[in-house]
């Protein structure tokens, strides 16, 4: 079985980002000031987002959970909203949860209900799934559920829904929840064609909101990457000034198989990284086009 590998050892400098993508949405053009939580209320853990749906967020989250649990760490998984109920799981659970949600719950030793507070049938974006059910998702409910999941000393792994700008509610995105929780971010991305643009856009959107991005994780990372995959890895690391790691193909969705892959990732170091102090001055007030994600768009502290 292929295992995760750390692809980049160089640690990027501590930086304050002032660039943002022009025209993604009005919300990117007018960022809210970041509200700092008291230290006692900040959960310990990681927020896993992705460049798209189906890019390996769940496998990455499950591998991290299994590796931490195997190392004796108390862990909890949290998924703000699950859609697509009714799909066959095929992983030994009688409930008709989506297969990836079953995998996430099993890795944390939790039931599907414990992992996800909100659940809907159609496999569509959360805000639409709620509308189709005649409901409205309230941001306060999402935040309360996430903070409740983080109660105690457990390490919390939050898996986002789709990409960073997917609306959880009509006016509330995955990014908004990540900002409110103040968890460091991991970005799951494909290693193949198209990933450079998708990953750098996600990275820019995260940094524009003041999120602390620890690394990009390419998944599944092949045992023998081709020239394009190696170039994609190096280009993302260079242009994004970001650590890039790789999670190998998990061939067996067992706790042992997931733990083996996850333990090859530097999760201990990621969790031990001190939170970067991000002041309101680092959050852009006006939209500015991104000409370069390297030195021209950062201020070295």
Predicted regions span which residues?
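Conserved catalytic-core segment of NTP-binding enzymes
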Residues: 54, 155, 160-246
